[in-house]
Amino acid sequence: MSADQEPVAFLAKQPWRPKQVTEDPDEEDEEDGDEGKNGFSLEEVLRLGGTKQDYLMLATLDENEEVVDGGKKGTIDDLQQGELESFIQNLNLAKYSKSLIEEDEPEKKENASKKEAKLLKVENKKQKATEGKKTSEKKVKNKTVAEQRPESCPVSKAKKDKQPDVFEFLERQTMLLRPGGKWYDMEYSGEYSLEPQPPDVVSKYKALAQKLYEHEVSLFKSKTNNQKGGSSTWMKAIVSSGTLADRMAAMILLIQDDAVHTLQFVETLMSLVKKKGSKQQCLMALDTFKELLITDLLPDSRKLRVFSQHPFHKLEEMSSGNKDSRDRRLILWYYEHQLKHLVAEFVQVLETLSHDSLVTTKTRALVAAHELLCDKPEEEKALLVQVINKLGDPQNRIATKASHLLEVLLRKHPNMKGVVCGEIERLLFRSNISPKAQYYAICFLNQMVLSHEESELANKLITLYFCFFRTCIKKKDIESKMLSAILTGVNRAYPYSQIGDDKVREQVDTLFKVLHVVNFNTSVQALMLLFQVMNSQQTISDRYYTALYRKMLDPGLTTCSKQAMFLNLIYKSLKADIMLRRVKAFVKRLLQVTCTQMPPFICGALYLVSEILKAKPDLRSQLDDHPESDEENFVDVGDDSDDEKFTDADKGTATDAVKEVESKETEPESSAEAEKPKAASWVHFDNLKGGKQIKTYDPFSRNPLFCGAENTTLWELKKLSEHFHPSVALFAKTILEGNCIQYSGDPLQDFTLMRFLDRFVYRNPKLHKGKENTDSVVMQPKRKHFMKNVRDLAVNSKEFLAKEESQIPVDEVFFYRYYKKVAVVKDKQKRSADEESIEDIDDEEFENMIDTFEDDNCFPPGKDDIDFASNMKKTKGAKADLEDSESSDGELGDLDDDEVSLGSMNDEDFEIDEDGGTFMDVSDDESEDAPEFADANPKANTKKSKRKSEDDFDFAGSFQGQKKKKKSFNDSSLFVSAEEFGHLLDENMGSKFDTIGMNAMANRDNASFKQLKWEAERDDWLHNRDVKSIIKKKKNFRKKMKAPQKPKRQRK
């Protein structure tokens, strides 16, 4: 190379930099100097046989800045594009470098300003450069660009080739998910995202997840098929060819073992539920599928998610590039998506079954929907709508069942009250809703238990109630049950609401108008609402007390079902009243009303009076004197005559009577008429002034303030103290004595006739429980029976009789005294029976007894055949205790005839009066000579006793009886004159058989003696009275006597 020729300049340093950077003039000058010194150029390399790549390699030997994707190009440690960057991002170093970044920002600004200055210099130098240099630089630049293009092309091609690999399906030889455990407890099942995902990405991942899941299931099947063992083989056989119940049980076991890989069995159960062939099969599969969802498939704390609700934009980041981890997530998410669709399909099937024609099918579907709603949050909105819709079912059983299930739901989940009320409100305002459905919905709402923290819900309910109240008034449907249910709901929701008084005042006048035309139960609800509204405002009006005073005389009080509520309302009203005169009038009328009521209501009213007297002691002045209203007072007029004038105690005093008589003489008739007492009506003008004074009691007054109740006494208590019911008499006497009634039970339930009859038959009454699994008991007062431990005992039990009489309730003293006497009698009878010794019969005695019946003549004539009393003969050696029997007879005499059973009666019970008795079989003259029978054994008919019952003939009694009193027995009454049966003697004259004994037979057809004898023997054989039968009985008896006997029963 000649010295005057300049070498070609080439910038090999950082060829990938931008154009403006590579054209730096300072660098060019430096490079030119270096190349000039070294004599190294591209042309030199080409001349020596090298290539362009050789030149680039040699030119970059001393450069340390040429790095491609984290490593030197062409070396072994060359990294893929972006791999180092992703690794650094995973280290999360960015959060630690915030302060460093802030410090580097001003330096970057300085560098940027320097670069701008350099660019200006470059532009100036370009103008001064020679044309040769420009041409050489352009060539070098063209070569460098050509060098850069082939390097950048493989990177972009690698990115394009790598993107389809994300959704590529790779088959594996092993399962990714291990069997066992709940699927929702696995590691990746709780990952979700609320952000919307790109639809195209979701569809691609879903297709990949489907392939992965199908491949996973196929691996599971091949694994189970290759298993060898008795249990697996038996399970396969049952699932394929067993009965319906066995198949479902086997499928449940398989699903419980591994739910993810056995989704096909879940689909099989779903198809059995949808099958329309057999109702029994459908219901069986329904219960099975429901239990499977509750116990194994559905999570407790969350709903199932669809496939698009998962974070696919972070999937690669969460899996850290691990395809196994990513595929596990995709399989679980796809399984959850499929399961959610199956559950939604099951809910639709429940909706279809709930409209079935059979009551059983509808009930089972309703119960299944309720259990899923209570236990799991999945599809709760659809299930709630189903249960609420059944409130309008045409059959009352289904509607009441739905109401009960909703109450159970609110007890388990109190936070759902607002949601349930909202759904019921939508049901009530439907256009095609039936009145019965509205009634059931209102009844459910008024049974809802509220609290003071739920004032908004109470306000909403009151607004709803008043809306339907106005509708009922417009329709003039005041006699319906709907109005009573609405008022009940308002009464229960008003204490918890914060609604304005204006809304309630709008309905007060309407309530007063409705009060007098509806039935008694509805009027009680209206009065309760009026009292709550007025009491909350401390403005209880006279109009309210007048309406309540009038309602006490309503005939419906006797038969209504809200007597307790009415008495409670009276008690609250009287306790809040400050007018003592009005309280006296209410107490007086209440005692008057009790005269026509049953004992339970009377006891409740007396208890109310006792509590009022305790709260207002000034009322005790009414108890000072107790004149009897039926008697009359004798008052002297003061005339010379001795005549007496009769005046009523309530109509006036003695001085008033004298004045009235004197006025008749002096004043004219017109003034006398003006003096007559007038019946008090509403509040008169004179009463307001205080000028009119009422001196007598007017029971027919409409206003309790001006009825004159303070001028009379509570004489009704005197009559009630003589009531036939012991509890009523006790309560009345307690009040008259000035004491308070101590009773903590419910008199309206404790003193009913049904409770008395339950105790009479030794059965404890049913406990009045509230609705099970509900909070309805919150609305009822606490029930504490007075002397509860005594009332729980049976009246004939030993524990009951062991109590003292003072510890027994008054209404059960009758049982106590009765069974006390019976227990004493039974105890003495047992003692006397134990003291009696029963002797065994010897063989000789039995032989003598048999000989009396065995005779050569089958028809033995004689008087002994008909001598019934001959059997009651005197025996020797018998043990008898006559004194004990006589003493027991005296103690039995204390009991009434109705209280003693026939088994405990003796001679004195059979004595005949002058007019005769029930057991009079002989004449009065001969009754004294009747034999005295022994006391009957109370256990004569038991298995252990050797005696027979009184109805059977006692053979052994003829030989071992007790000592009897020596009384002659005249048997003349057993025979009659021969004229009465003389015609029988005439007809049977000349026959050789008995015609006058107890075995006599008539022979009107003149049958032969042999014929009659054969018939007699046949009759004896049929009735086991022949000789062979008697001998057989004798042998059996001897065997029985030779057998070892049981020891005698010990005395108690």
From Swiss-Prot:
**Which cysteine residues pair off into disulfide bonds?**
none
The entry's localization annotation reads: Nucleus
**Keyword Transcription regulation in record:** yes
Query: Which GO cellular component term is one of those annotated?
Result: CCAAT-binding factor complex
Q: Which SUPFAM superfamilies match?
A: ARM repeat
Tell me the tissue specificity. Ubiquitous.
Keyword check for Transcription, yes or no: yes
Q: Which UniProt keywords apply?
A: Activator, Nucleus, Phosphoprotein, Transcription, Transcription regulation
Region spans: Disordered: 1-40, 122-158, 621-677, 876-969, 1032-1052
Q: What InterPro entries does UniProt report for this protein, alphabetically?
A: ARM-type_fold, CCAAT-binding_factor, CEBPZ/Mak21-like
Task performed by this protein:
Stimulates transcription from the HSP70 promoter.
In which family does this protein belong, per the annotation?
Belongs to the CBF/MAK21 family.
By what name is this protein known?
CCAAT/enhancer-binding protein zeta
